[in-house]
Amino acid sequence: MLDGIRYIINRDSNEVWENLIKQTTLASAVETDGVGLHTAVPVHVRLTPAPPDTGYVFRRTDLGGFEIPATVESVAHCGYATTLMRTGVMLSTVEHLLSALRGLGVDNVYIDVDNLEIPILDGSAEVFAEMIEKAGIVSQPLARRALLVREKVAFEQGNRRISVEPGDHYQIDCLIDFPHPMIGVQQFSIDLNNGAFSREIAAARTFGFTDEIEALRRANLIRGGSLDNAIVLTPDGMLNKTGLRFRDEFVRHKILDIIGDLALLGMPILGKVVAERSGHIMHAGLMSKLLRVRSAWDIVDVPETHVQSPRSNVQSLVSAT
């Protein structure tokens, strides 16, 4: 859990806990099988309910249940996927699963996996979202916490940038720019409320370019990649015969990645994320910088009315968490 100041809404009211959004977990366990995008190894993943304040915890069942918490501190590599590590034990390509959990508002889950990479499935978060919906989501007795942004924090590398700024709820605005006839400049904005993730983001697939494939495979990457789990772009089109799921599927997938990577903060964001030509490395850079700028955020209990004005509802300082 992040070190920060916890606020509570209407602390002296007898109805305080009824007016706060509760933490959630799964109602039952759910599982699936697949292969790793980069390793091509078969992998089984099982999601199980977890107690309040657990967050997302990966457990390597092939290593005796060794736990790797899904936190910023666990990030080891973030080139073509986000890889976590704890005391030398790694787990790769976690972002799509974390995106589904955060996008659907699940706070606490144990994720059991029997190999070193989360399965790529169809290249999106749709299968994970369907698993979560099948399992069901239940409320827990403790209030949900969120990272309330108070000051803008930005991270930049050349013409790539990503920032987070104050906002009344979790919003993401993303722009991408690829010199390809099917992409070009695309921009999409989303407010992560009222089922928007399932409707607008979950089905957007990862994508790559044919002129990069051989170099990636020589680097022992994308060995499990295929037309079944990625959009593969030629210089003037795409190899997939099934077409796009959205006209702007590419930028939507970038938002999917942002949600998954920023889930490593351990709680939803009350603020607006703005990304231009971003990627996993940029996301990790923003999170690290944000946590260092202690004046830029607070940890709050989330009121049911947070979409109107969370900052105006914060009344009482109680304790450090």
Give, region by region, the residue ranges found by the protein language model.
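C-terminal regulatory domains involved in ligand/effector binding and gene-expression control
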Residues: 2-107, 112-321
